[in-house]
């Protein structure tokens, strides 16, 4: 069995494709569940289907476990922790918005601005929309059939902002970085500046519309989950937190996911981060693998371990399962 004493408070394990990374992570999970109990160790992977396959392998190995999903996803870990915190505090429990509910909120926000135009009472966001569309009669661009295209862009914008952790307090910094190259501002970067200036107030209006639509509930987008969970980490009691989190395919974590892991690390949760930057497949959704691996070492003080290829050799059922997803 793996010796957990060989791990630091944060350990970053890097291995080539098919070198046995997932099997290494599973071995660590089995050892941690033996030491800490089934509730205090968890493994996060990049997708639900992989989680189910690996979770079944763990359950077969241990015969019985106290948590239904010993292998899950990082958002599920965040949701579980936030639910525990809010339940103890007597607050409404988190519930994710589905796609239809999100569409209703987005269209409500856009309809408010078309209403401003119709009444001749344009607001600051209306002015930004006019600049964004570069036409005087911009309201037609977010109404009727045209609304579908812009609503889709709006939805994607919300997700990308949340995934990179673009908080309101970073607005001025992000706009400045997007707009300038040295002391010059070209047309492309000016366009980026306009987009960022519009994105922040629209997201603020969207968040307020969610609160107005569900005044007695705590509703949030799936992409917003990691941000809110990070804020809740400081409120968590020790029993709400695992002793060890193992993250397989760490290269596919979002920046918001990294912030969540950093907050847990600051609370004393041990981290085992396993992956390979060259195997990233989620860069289009806010994953920056090279940055993640550098930041794990510089910000968390993670010790780098390079996995030897011979670790993949294993005749066990667990090893066979891991080899298919490593």
Where are these regions (language model features)?
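Short, conserved loop/helix-junction motifs that constitute active-site signature segments
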Residues: 36, 239-241, 263-268
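Conserved P-loop NTPase-based nucleic-acid remodeling module centered on helicase motor cores
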Residues: 40-159, 294
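Conserved Walker B
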Residues: 246-253, 277-278
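Post-Walker A helix-loop "phosphate-sensing" segment adjacent to the P-loop in P-loop NTPases
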Residues: 31-41
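Accessory N-terminal region flanking or inserted into the helicase ATPase core
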Residues: 1-17, 24, 130-246, 257
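Hydrophobic "anchor" residues on beta-strands that sit immediately upstream
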Residues: 69, 244-247, 272
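Conserved RecA-like helicase ATPase core segment
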Residues: 258-326
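Helicase P-loop NTPase motor core
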Residues: 2-7, 11-33, 301-303, 308-326
